[in-house]
Structures are given as C-alpha cells and as structure tokens.
Regions:
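A charge-rich, low-complexity, intrinsically flexible signal that marks solvent-exposed coils, linkers
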Residues: 1-113
Length: 113
C-alpha cells in the first residue's frame, strides 16, 4: 500500500510539473473546450437540456470574452466554437420552446444576449 501511495504521489508531482510547464493559455483553452463539450452534451439530449447548456455556454463565453487577446493560438478556434454552440442553442431553443418561453419569457444568456 505504501508503494502505491508513493507511486500516486510521484504521478501527481509529474502532472503538476507538466501543467506548470505549459502556457496558462493552453491549459485554459483546454478547459474552455470542456465547457463546449459539456454544452454539446446537454444540447444533444432528447429533449435538449437547455438550462444546463446555458450554464456551460455562459461559462465559455465569460472566459473567451474576458481573455480576448490572451488565449494564444487557440483564440480563433475558441471564438468559432462559441459561435457554433450559441447558434445550435438558438436553433434548438426555437425547435423546443420551454414552457416559460411559450408564455412570453425568454431564456437569457446562451444566445449571446
């Protein structure tokens, strides 16, 4: 058991070393794509889980818009991914109106408003 703990500690130290060596913009871009994937998962549900997709899309937008010019080579890709997932959200929202939006209330956030 002690050997397993030592091996796990060594592995954690190696992961920390690799993360510390990577540019922060690369690590953040990876996490932003995780938000994209999370939104896509919620949008692909039947029916789409629009409230949960909104959270992921809003998180993605918050990071991309706040760090303009600081996301390195991944920035154009992240902006395009954000635009695509927002477009998918709008299309699915129109095809699957929630009871609240049918009553005149619209969901805020993920559509870019």
């Amino acid at each position: 058991e002690r050997e397993q703990l030592e091996a796990a500690a060594a592995e954690m130290a190696e992961v920390q070393r690799r993360v510390a060596a990577a540019p922060a913009s690369d690590v953040i871009a990876n996490h932003v794509m995780g938000f994209y994937e999370l939104a896509a998962i919620h949008l692909s549900q039947q029916p789409p889980n629009l409230p949960q997709a909104t959270v992921a899309i809003d998180a993605m937008r918050a990071v991309v818009e706040t760090l303009v010019g600081r996301l390195g080579e991944a920035e154009p890709t992240l902006k395009e991914a954000l635009a695509q997932v927002q477009m998918a959200f709008v299309q699915l929202s129109e095809a699957n109106p929630s009871p609240a939006s049918e009553g005149g209330q619209e969901e805020s956030g993920a559509d870019g408003a």
